[in-house]
Amino acid sequence: PAIIIGLLGAGHQAWSAMRFLEVAGQADIRTRFMLALAYDCGLRREELCTVATGDIDPSQRLLTVRAEHTKNRFGRVVPYSPVTGELYTAWLTERRMLSSSRGPLFLSRSPRNRAEPISNWTWSKVVRGLAIKADLPLISTHTFRHLCLTELARVGWDIHEIAAFAGHRRIQSTLLYIHLSARDLSSRFNYTVASLHTCRLTVLQQQDPSP
């Protein structure tokens, strides 16, 4: 059955997200990549901030969300779009200037804690700043998780497929989740929302603003 998953009305939610992304398109490469990955993969804040270098498979465009960083300790493997893949490559170039070591993917550039993993609090502060700039104070990382899942439902994904993509163990209290392979999810993603995400996320591909 078709379902709507969202904090805002579907139309307003999509408009707000697009407005936010347009503002975020002027941000630094780390911020743009993190937003794109959160949106593509329907990530919770902690899942996003704790992504490690070894969690991404660029050849297949797959992200492994490790169970220990999820709300319900249920890991998953999810695909991401070509645009997000390009942003990933660009961020890796900058990350190497901060650290050549494997480990947390998202590092701080602040002189006080240079090359330290970005914290949930720091990321929330970044998103909050962009939300205020866009005059959309209710936008958060979780907004993009809701939008991603709503769009999967809109284009015909089965509720069990959405549960697997989102890392939900159950649908309400009666429906059990269905295990889908990463290949199944990737094929479904490419045939459905990949083009829609690509259209929206191109605003994050803009060049970094001059210092």
Set out the residue ranges of the language-model regions.
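Conserved catalytic core of the tyrosine transesterase superfamily
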Residues: 1-211
